[in-house]
Amino acid sequence: MRRRYLEAWRKFSARQALEPLEAQLAAVIAEHPEYIGWLESGEAALLAQFTPAGGRENPFLHMGLHLAIREQVATDRPAGIARVHSELTGRSGDAHEAEHRMIEPLAEALWEAQRSGQPPDEARYLERLQRL
């Protein structure tokens, strides 16, 4: 998947036609200019390791969580997430900032699901989002 990010950005930068997923990837990259130079490093970006001890945020994970939230909002799953996103966007005036606020509850829900071996608890996840 990492290579898809790099390829989408390369094609976007060259003004080439993008497939739908590539367009989504390029859009989220464009909203994170702090990652662009690093992504353009090519192989170094593909091979980079991100560990809690390293203290570096994983750009691929961060952008992937943006994409996950966008998909959840588009499908309103869990039911009510589109309203939460709309309210957060209204308060901040910025949909991207709303997504940043929503990332931590999503990451927590995914971590808990992985740890328990169960699907994410959508009700608990939505409750966390509603408290933002």
Predicted regions and their residues:
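N-terminal leader/targeting peptides and immediately adjacent processing regions
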Residues: 1-34
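Non-catalytic, well-ordered alpha-helical scaffold segments
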Residues: 3, 19-23, 62-67, 82, ...
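Charge-rich, solvent-exposed alpha-helical interaction surfaces
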Residues: 4, 84-87, 128
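Intrinsically disordered or highly flexible coil/loop and linker segments, enriched in small
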Residues: 14, 18, 34-35, 78-79, ...
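Aromatic-anchored, charged helix-turn/loop surface patch used as a conserved interaction hotspot
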Residues: 21-90
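Amphipathic alpha-helical core segments of compact helical bundles
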Residues: 66, 70, 74, 89, ...
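Sequence termini and other peripheral, non-core segments
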Residues: 86, 91, 95-99, 131
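Glycine-rich, aromatic-bearing surface loops/beta-hairpins
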Residues: 115, 119-132
